[in-house]
Amino acid sequence: MGQKINPTGFRLAVTKNWTSRWYANNTDFAKMLKEDVDVRIYLKKKLKNASVSKVVIERPAKNARITIYSSRPGVVIGKKGEDIEVLRRELQKRMGVPVHVNIEEIRKPEVDAQLIADSITQQLEKRIMFRRAMKRAMQNAMRLGAQGIKIMSSGRLNGAEIARREWYREGRVPLHTLKADIDYATSEAETTYGIIGVKVWVYKGDTLGRGAEAQAAATSAEPAAEEKKTRRAPSKTAARKPAAGTDKPLVAAKPAVKRVRKVETPAADTQKSGE
């Protein structure tokens, strides 16, 4: 089932966290959830050229805090912060509460699954061959530190009459290992032949998860245990220290002497009996 389930939902509360972080009662839950969906759709259209990876929405005490993760924060902020102020006012009008907008920069966009998927779909819309776009994205991700990547495209590839799906994988992508940090994303390319879907899985290594502190303590205790094992008992030939409170000088230990047992051989008879 690791091949079928959504990797992000499979790891929620284990190694992944929710992108909407708030609590609501039964009457307000549906309204607030719809607001989150509308805000994400609006930001996706508004910041289409800003390389936005994800949007985290928090609602502390009748306020809203929206964090936008982008590899091009300058496009989001605009000249002298004008664009982000317009964006904040529009979001405040849509949500009906005071909104604070934060921008987080993504240092390695080549390893981010959402940005990889969006890049491939943009190339497909420009009529670039899907195999070339997929292989180029895989090479860039592996070059910049990804331990594994898998990309799948499905639809009328190259304008074929019969829809099909093709996928390529490089490195390891352990989908059923819960401690594996799998970044998963999807995107759609609107071509003249129809919609082509792109799915991306990026394996970034193993994470410690909730028991991070316990495992970190265990790993730090291992070198100390190895040091104890490698320590040897002091040699018997070491110098002996005088007792505390005495003025006696340090007495060097006597070298160990091997005792040899001397066996006396009986004297040989010089005369034979009867002579």
UniProtKB/Swiss-Prot annotation:
Subunit description: Part of the 30S ribosomal subunit. Forms a tight complex with proteins S10 and S14.
A Pfam family assignment: KH_2
Region feature (Disordered): 216-275
Name of this protein: Small ribosomal subunit protein uS3
Signal peptide limits: none
Name of the coding gene: rpsC
NCBIfam families: rpsC_bact
Family annotation (InterPro entries): KH_dom, KH_dom-like_a/b, KH_dom_type_2, KH_sf_prok-type, Ribosomal_S3_C_sf, Ribosomal_uS3_bac-typ, Ribosomal_uS3_C, Ribosomal_uS3_CS
GO cellular component, one term: cytosolic small ribosomal subunit
